[in-house]
């Protein structure tokens, strides 16, 4: 399990966001308080952060290494994940 619907959170007023990176790749992401199926890779950076005042790291699947999104660290020390929605699949056990 990557994450669960119960861990959805609103960041900057919404759970869902659409952003483009500096190369023009567009991502629809959802924000989650937890994503135990993700591992953060690399050092946190503020470069091109989509959420002002946050640092980010790439988040990959712990099982296969697929890029699933980003882990964000807020100035108050809190964290959340911005996960690429079309890379997440719901299974019966996480629909409850």
Protein language model features and the residues they cover:
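A short Gly-Trp-Pro
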Residues: 1-96
